């Protein structure tokens, strides 16, 4: 069937909630993906920050094949070796103490909120359970994580949302101080806001937040669903800041393309939880954990010697050079290979034109071109994208 036929079938049978681009992708390898007609694209979105090791990395594929032939699912009534190995790996890498596995970033964030509230209530004896999150944040699409995501375009139509959430501006420590009450249980922050437009936390800000949480006995949650797993050049974005969270959430790139989420937390908080307090049927299944173990090992190699950080700096420099030619580019910002270029207008047409030229990119918050390439990206890939972007911008300028 043709690409158009498949698109027509999707429109007939699938729930129409995605504003998809008009392309049917059928194959991926490394930086490249191919559509049903055989056209090649360079992927600078990586499945929205999922394919950090590239498409179908041989080590991840081999791990999936091997595990699929052995044991796929048992439930968490039983012990499984890949889950135990992955928990150990994430604890060692993060410096935290225990891990819980689920299936997505939204589930991980929902779990983090539950764990924080249980700890503050049961151990600290403080009721209220209020969570403070940031404007421009995105924490998920469940009702609870929507309540932590203060954007009308996501929340509208889904009221009433669960109570107990408060919002403050990102990078504003004074506003955060004013928002804290004796009901505050946790502060939830993305060290680099992704969906909100690639906003990087100030170093002094995260340190001040950590001090504030220590002083007030408040749980600090870092949502690294998008900015974690090597995306910023460190395994976890918080490593750039010398600030450790009480709870860390992960997903997206953790599984190398296979759905898996994780909550990694300190022992003090873990002690507040007992059998039956939380759970999942599929979370931490052998297949997902085997894929994740392979993915983490590959990422460890990719981020060595600041390679990802240097690629990110190169990418940002090349984008900044375009500002001199095109005054409608307001700002370029990012950390590692999590990069945004803010425009003075909606970037949806830019995304479509780049697709025509063979590049997958994204626009978030209406005006921010978002670049999340696999960590295997090379300078020649970046140069090719910049040249294509230059051509598109030139057409617009005319």
Curated annotation (Swiss-Prot):
Leading EC class: transferase
InterPro entries: AcOrn/SuccOrn_fam, Aminotrans_3, Aminotrans_3_PPA_site, Class-III_PLP-dep_AT, PyrdxlP-dep_Trfase, PyrdxlP-dep_Trfase_major, PyrdxlP-dep_Trfase_small
Binding site for N(2)-acetyl-L-ornithine: 141, 280
Compartments it resides in: Cytoplasm
N6-(pyridoxal phosphate)lysine: residues bearing it: 252
Free-text comment on the cofactor: Binds 1 pyridoxal phosphate per subunit.
Catalytic activity: N(2)-acetyl-L-ornithine + 2-oxoglutarate = N-acetyl-L-glutamate 5-semialdehyde + L-glutamate
Stored Pfam families: Aminotran_3
GO BP annotations, alphabetical order: L-arginine biosynthetic process
Cofactor: pyridoxal 5'-phosphate
UniProt cross-references to CDD domains, sorted A to Z: OAT_like (cd00610)
GO cellular component: a single term: cytoplasm
Gene3D superfamilies given in the database record: Aspartate Aminotransferase, domain 1, Type I PLP-dependent aspartate aminotransferase-like (Major domain)
Any one GO MF annotation of this record: N2-acetyl-L-ornithine:2-oxoglutarate 5-aminotransferase activity
UniProt keyword annotations, A-Z: Amino-acid biosynthesis, Aminotransferase, Arginine biosynthesis, Cytoplasm, Pyridoxal phosphate, Transferase
Pathway in which this enzyme or protein is active: Amino-acid biosynthesis; L-arginine biosynthesis; N(2)-acetyl-L-ornithine from L-glutamate: step 4/4
Binding site for pyridoxal 5'-phosphate: 105-106, 138, 223-226, 281
EC number: 2.6.1.11
Quaternary structure and interacting proteins, as annotated: Homodimer.
Miscellaneous: May also have succinyldiaminopimelate aminotransferase activity, thus carrying out the corresponding step in lysine biosynthesis.
Family, as annotated: Belongs to the class-III pyridoxal-phosphate-dependent aminotransferase family. ArgD subfamily.
Protein name: Acetylornithine aminotransferase
Gene: argD
């Amino acid at each position: 069937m043709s690409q158009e036929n498949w698109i027509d079938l999707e429109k007939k049978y699938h729930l129409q909630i995605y504003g998809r681009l008009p392309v049917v992708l059928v194959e991926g390898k490394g930086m490249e993906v191919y559509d049903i007609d055989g056209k090649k694209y360079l992927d600078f979105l990586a499945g929205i920050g999922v394919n950090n090791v590239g498409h179908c990395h041989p080590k991840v594929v081999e791990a999936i094949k091997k595990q699929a032939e052995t044991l796929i699912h048992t439930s968490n009534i039983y012990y499984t070796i890949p889950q135990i190995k992955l928990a150990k790996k994430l604890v060692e890498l993060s410096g935290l103490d225990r891990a819980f596995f689920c299936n997505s970033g939204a589930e991980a964030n929902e779990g983090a909120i539950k764990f924080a509230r249980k700890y503050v209530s049961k151990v600290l004896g403080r009721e209220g359970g209020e969570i403070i999150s940031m404007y421009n944040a995105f924490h998920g699409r469940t009702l609870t994580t929507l309540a932590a995501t203060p954007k009308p375009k996501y929340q509208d139509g889904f009221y009433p949302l669960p109570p107990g959430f408060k919002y403050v501006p990102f990078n504003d420590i004074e506003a955060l101080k004013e928002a804290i009450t004796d009901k505050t249980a946790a502060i939830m922050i993305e060290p680099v806001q992704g969906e909100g437009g690639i906003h990087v936390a100030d170093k002094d800000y995260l340190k001040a937040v950590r001090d504030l949480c220590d002083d007030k006995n408040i749980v600090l949650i870092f949502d690294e669903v998008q900015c974690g797993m090597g995306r910023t050049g460190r395994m976890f974005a918080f490593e750039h800041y010398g600030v450790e969270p009480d709870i860390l959430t992960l997903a997206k790139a953790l599984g190398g393309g296979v759905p898996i989420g994780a909550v990694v937390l300190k022992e003090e908080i873990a002690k507040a939880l007992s059998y039956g307090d939380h759970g999942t049927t599929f979370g931490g299944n052998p297949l997902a954990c085997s894929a994740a173990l392979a993915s983490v090992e590959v990422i460890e190699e990719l981020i060595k010697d600041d390679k990802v950080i240097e690629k990110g700096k190169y990418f940002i420099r090349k984008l900044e050079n375009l500002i001199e030619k095109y005054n409608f580019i307001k700002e370029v910002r990012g950390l590692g290979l999590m990069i945004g270029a803010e425009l003075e207008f909606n970037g949806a047409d830019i995304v479509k034109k780049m697709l025509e030229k063979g590049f997958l990119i994204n626009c978030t918050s209406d005006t921010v071109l978002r670049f999340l390439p696999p960590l295997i990206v090379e300078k020649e890939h970046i140069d090719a994208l910049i040249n294509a972007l230059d051509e598109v911008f030139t057409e617009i300028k005319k």
